Amino acid sequence: MLAAISRALEERDQTPGHGARVAALAEPIAYRLGWDARRIGLLRFGAPLHDIGKVSVRREVLLKAGPLTLEELAEIRVHPRAGAHLVLPLRGAREALPYVLFHHEWWNGGGYPIGLRGCAIPVEARLLGIADAFDAMTSARPYRHALTPERALGEVDACAGTQFDPELAALFCETWSTQPIAAAS
């Protein structure tokens, strides 16, 4: 059921395949971190669900071509908590909670919804946040063109230590600078 909601959401906000791409971007780094098969399986399960809370966001806000108002930004920032409310009651989905709730937390504490910082952010969410941002940057959106993978890797590197865990960002850039990345459409 959650997977169907996630796919419907991707169609609704014109990001088809986003969750699968995020999982594919994060998985090689998870292997390099020594995650076991169970943990990799949770990544594959949780990554496509990470934005499920966007079902609570109005479509016109998700597709807005210009800058968001403060009210619209507040609406967007509710999606991690809304997603947590969707997955928490479902026994089999609870382990996806770090991916859903914390993927917009920043290494320096400037993220949302809670403002966690550093290692207080679950490593699963820190890794997913990098993969999520990279896929967003390399995907065309109503409000901007897609960046090349090389330019997006430069952005990940530039945000290491502020938005992203510096060690994970370095590992992500090292991994994906030596492998071809198919940019999203």
PLM segments and residue spans:
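Histidine- and acidic-residue-rich, metal-dependent catalytic cores
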Residues: 1-185
